[in-house]
Amino acid sequence: VITVVGHADLTAQTLKLLETELSDRLRCLAQPGSMVLVRAGCGLPVAAGRAARRARLPLVVVLPSQDAVPALLPGRDQAAAGELLFLAAHVRLLPYDPADRDACASADERLVYSSSRLLAVWDGSPAHDQDATADVIASAHGRRIATETLWAPGYARHSRSPSSDEPS
């Protein structure tokens, strides 16, 4: 299983570029029986799902659950989840709160622990209250899970304003 995680605030241009790069990397890394695993959400998970389809690899989508029933995703992630479910060969339920950053980071770590390889889209920045990508990568390294980070010239994230750290 190849898990794909990364920044949630990638620009549209970066996501387009990533679809191609991820597809190429997935083709190179794929072994017989390989699958691609993502946590449902907008942005990178959709790019990874499309890349898995291009690479002809089955996609496993993880949805949040409460009491073994799928939980409602935040509004911006709902349409993306629909596309991911269309692309998915398998769906897994995982108990976590999709509106809680720490719960999402913990869910990502559980995905990584169940995989043989991590593909992380990461610009090298430290973790902060809106992004735990660095922590997930450190956790994978601690578990000796093969990890590859992707960040090419031209990739960008949306600018963070000082008020973006405040809950909405």
Name each region found by the language model.
Residues V1-P167:
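Acidic/glycine-enriched connector segments
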